[in-house]
Amino acid sequence: VAIAINKDVDILFVIDNSGSMAEEQALLSKNFAAFISVLEDPEVLANYRIGITTTDSGNPRCPSAQYTPEGGNLVLSSCLDRVDQGEFTFNSDDFSKTCTDFCTKRNADLTVRGTATGVDPNEVPRKWIERIEKVSNINGVADNTEAFQCYGPQGVAGCGFESHLESMYLALAGAASPKSKNNYGFLRDAAILSIVVITDEVDCSYNPATKEIFTTNKVFWNDPAVDTAPTSSLCWFAGVECTGGPGTYSECHSQNWDKDRKVTTDPAAAVLQPVSKYIDFVKSIEEKKQEIDENQRVLISLITGVPVGYDTFDKEIPYEDRPADDEEQINFGIGPGCILGDVNAPTATARPPVREREFAEAFLDDPKTERNLYSICQDSYAAALESIATKIRDQIVPACMPSCVRDKDRSTPVLDPNCRLIETNIKGEEKDIPQCTEVNGAWTAGNGANVCFATLIDKTGKETLSKIDNISDYCNMEGFNLEFVLVRSAPAAAGTTISANCELSDNRTLDCPNL
């Protein structure tokens, strides 16, 4: 029987590093403990990786000769070192406090411990944060919250024509490409994948074949007759269509426009990359994961320009124009989706998402009953981050044996199972997994093995002397009488699957009365 024994979680953060994102990045650092604490809860103990990239994948208006856009590359560098490089300066304003309020460690103070991946058995430093079997790969910090507070802030010197979706695409594509030095091996075949985007503007993932819309073709510019350069309003006009209005719109949706501002059904002619490109790509990743665990879902979350309360259905996204001569209308093509502070003198505003909203909603079972967008216009992201992490936690389902297992010795109150766990590699070669032993209250592999399995058999928590062999509430409620735990000291090779071969009960009424 195929078994999904999985506490592995791969989390990609796509962080807007444009000039308006200083306070938002600071809040992310300030509240990140709310995220990590869920994953590291003793009842969860996720084996997680956290990769970080930015929304900057380059643009004709942001000359690559002057800087190097991340382009989806995972980055792992202390923000203190990047303060010195000017990455926290925008329009001559110093936003270094975004980093220095929470980070005290430079790269020289931080050591990235070498780790193996499913595609590379060599233990070398990777461009991500990870914690596997309660051991972090970052030395020099108290915990991974502190690590993220140094590695997470991405500065404010990035391109203002943000490409959230393309950056995400490049990051995930790179994870499967040996050509990507930073990203290759980041994704694990069976791991839960969570993608988190933090941004205050709309997606502007452009088609390189029509890049002239940023330079010589002014059809999407705010005022083609007057403007000498486009504003971010181009991203709205080139990727969105609304009904109703002008003024207040009843709804807005993504639209594929060609270079003449006509609707096109040809993806290659669309001036912004069609949203379907990104949905189909991530769906293909999800489908491969579902070959291992049919219940696994890719999780998408955005902290973006929606009102506080949108995630709980208490508010809806406003799509409203500002007056034509209003600075926000000129700069963005649409009014704010959310406002922080006084409406007449807001501390911050953010644009209402459309393309990225549609992408995120494509990974919900029913957008009418659940939402995965949280407001960026608030003083704390703790609740949003906790909610995002909780959705990850809820995907980490205990590995119940999905059949009733025979008790070899019914003279004792606990199950005495006869089981083998088998690891099968991508070539179809099988290997028996040894059983763990309990050492000082922890499951441990012996004889140099890098993987072992344990059987959890105590239904009440009082049937054995061990404190770590209790069956989870989940498996108990499902009526199963056996649960597995897999302990690894090194990652499984890509394509590895796990199956269980147990002697099954010939008396389910006795062995599994609740099944």
Name what the model sees in each region.
Residues 1-515:
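Divalent cation-coordinating acidic motifs and surrounding scaffolds
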